[in-house]
């Protein structure tokens, strides 16, 4: 269970219109909306949480239900059984969540590490995903089962264990924001979420990052897919998003190139929630031709 410090941080970032729901092993935030459109499910990145999506949830159209999960091992969501999970393990949890909510189909957004999960769900369970958005995509490192994590990935959980959540977040968090000294609220939101990271959930997510192969799943996509990234992202730079957009099969292409969101770094939905919401509302309301 999360500590009281985590709970208080979460409460500060929640809206009265958003409900916290424990759905099986997953802790989620739900902003209820009309039932005549598929809900939108939001999957966060490795250093983030469901409550990080609050500004975006406020800015998105109220014409649909919006759900933001805490990934397995984050907040009050139960960690996965394997200490070295792969993307299929996380994708299975998404499908269990959809089944528990009796949702035959959703629109799906993944941010950063969440793009690995979102793309795998859409590629392997295409009937469950109507439209997809990959925001600040990460390619993953593609290590084979049993291989050691790349040093840069292995260092993450080790550093968390050594420093503790607060110091870890203070060190790593500002890099996610473009010109953090001028975006105090966004930077503090990043740090607040990152300070709640715990083991084993963060270490399991590092294994997902190490083993992920985003382009393999992107090649299998059939649903209309948006790829977008902050123009100033130094964590997953725009060239990565361009590669992802170029790898989409013709039937998944909605725009000829990745969309660049100007003036934003990696934490794009916290830096410019209104701009990101407008982009997503257009994408998820379009008819694919």
Task: State each model region's role.
Residues 264-273, 277:
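Catalytic histidine-centered segment of alpha/beta-hydrolase-like enzymes
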Residues 89-106:
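Conserved acidic catalytic loop of the alpha/beta-hydrolase fold
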Residues 242, 246-266:
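Catalytic histidine neighborhood in serine/cysteine hydrolases
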Residues 144-149, 161-219:
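Conserved alpha/beta-hydrolase catalytic His-Asp/Glu region
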Residues 24-79:
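Conserved HGGG/HGGXW glycine-rich cap/lid loop of the alpha/beta-hydrolase fold
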Residues 119, 123-124, 129-162:
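Flexible "cap/lid" loop of the alpha/beta hydrolase fold
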Residues 1-40, 61-64, 103-104, 257, ...:
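Alpha/beta-hydrolase fold catalytic core
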Residues 221, 227-229, 233:
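Short beta-strand/loop motif that positions the catalytic acidic residue
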